[in-house]
């Protein structure tokens, strides 16, 4: 809150409370899963299904309509846990679908995933190499002017990881 206020002031945002988070009810159904074989048509259809799901969920919510809807799906953490599906944030529709771990030990990484996908809804782009997951230099680094450049102590939210070298994070 104080950090958000300071960042908002630095960017010239004159809102008293630039961010407000309200937790809604548990949805009665799951949002549509990402397609197994993503292509332009399947992604477009999935996006429409997700938007429809979000609209139905908002209609059934007694709270005022949100500017951004974030759906958090929690999974088990630990041995035998399934691979986590990708999380996504849609700027058209202001909807984020996040896959998180339901364990206190994952609170930090869950917060990064939530922030990352919310920023996507606002138009932010990824700052990592899609093939390797490695943060891109310099835009994916938390301290772009640091000397020596690696290892980094901080990360760029849109990079998703903290670079320890040019090839590792």
For each of these PLM feature ranges, what is it?
Residues 3-7, 118-121, 125, 164:
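Structured segments of extracytoplasmic/periplasmic soluble domains
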Residues 87-92, 96, 100-105, 133-169:
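Metalloprotease/metallohydrolase-associated module, dominated by Zn2+-dependent proteases
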Residues 26-28, 75, 103, 162-163:
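Residues that form or immediately flank small-molecule/cofactor binding pockets and catalytic motifs
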Residues 6-11, 54-60, 81-87, 140-148:
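Intrinsically disordered, low-complexity boundary segments flanking structured domains
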Residues 10, 131-132:
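A generic "cationic amphipathic patch" detector
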Residues 52-129:
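Active-site-proximal segment of zinc-dependent metalloprotease catalytic domains
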